[in-house]
Curated annotation (Swiss-Prot):
It comes from the Eukaryota. Its main location: mitochondrion. Interacts with the iron-sulfur protein subunit within the SDH catalytic dimer. Pfam families: Complex1_LYR_2 (PF13233). This is Succinate dehydrogenase assembly factor 3, mitochondrial. Keywords: Chaperone, Gluconeogenesis, Mitochondrion, Transit peptide. Signal peptide: none annotated. Residues 152-162 have a biased composition (Basic and acidic residues). One of its GO terms (cellular component) is mitochondrial matrix. Coiled coil: none annotated. Residues 149-173 are annotated as: Disordered. Belongs to the complex I LYR family. SDHAF3 subfamily.
Length: 173
């Protein structure tokens, strides 16, 4: 997954990351959340595994989208050598994990969050395009007009079509 380079600075950074806390950050101000997140960054493989584990509590469709996105992002960033980029990447994913864990503990589960307009202004065109693609994919997964339906919806449609045709459908138990 993530292979640290032989540079001394990166080794010391990874050593500091390995000694970080596992506790999720409670909701609070964004500035304090960033400071606390940086103080509790997890090593890359451990962070990746915790995110994948947290996704298990999502809806199956959201889990599939989230797992694929996380896997792709970690693959894209596995050869980064710049410690600042590594810290930025890991702290952003740690903030996501903390938000996911806090929201999953609340009634109604994970609901997501709107992006900060200031954050959008700082993004490159490629990053904005990636977010737009992710938004489109998730909207299509839950749209009644979409060509591909989530698995539960496909079963419902198949059962309805069979009932309309006068056929009985065997139910799995």
């Amino acid at each position: 997954m993530f292979r640290p380079s032989t540079s001394l600075a990166l080794r010391s950074t990874l050593r500091q990351l390995a000694s970080a806390s596992n506790q999720p950050i409670p909701p609070g101000s964004e500035i304090n959340a960033v400071k606390r997140t940086v103080a509790t960054i997890l090593p890359p493989i451990r962070l990746y595994r915790r995110i994948i584990r947290a996704h298990r509590r999502l809806d199956p469709d959201m889990r599939a989208v989230g797992d694929n996105y996380v896997k792709d992002e970690f693959r894209r960033h596995k050869n980064i050598d710049n410690p600042l980029q590594i810290i930025g990447f890991l702290s952003s994913w740690k903030m996501y994990l903390d938000q996911l864990e806090v929201q999953q503990g609340q009634p109604g589960g994970f609901r997501g969050q709107r992006l900060d307009p200031q954050l959008l202004e700082k993004m490159s065109d490629e990053q904005i395009y990636q977010i737009h693609e992710l938004m489109t994919a998730t909207q299509e997964a839950y749209s009644d007009k979409a060509q591909a339906f989530p698995p539960e919806k496909q079963r419902e449609l198949a059962e309805k079509a069979a009932a309309d045709a006068g056929l009985s459908v065997k139910k799995d138990e």
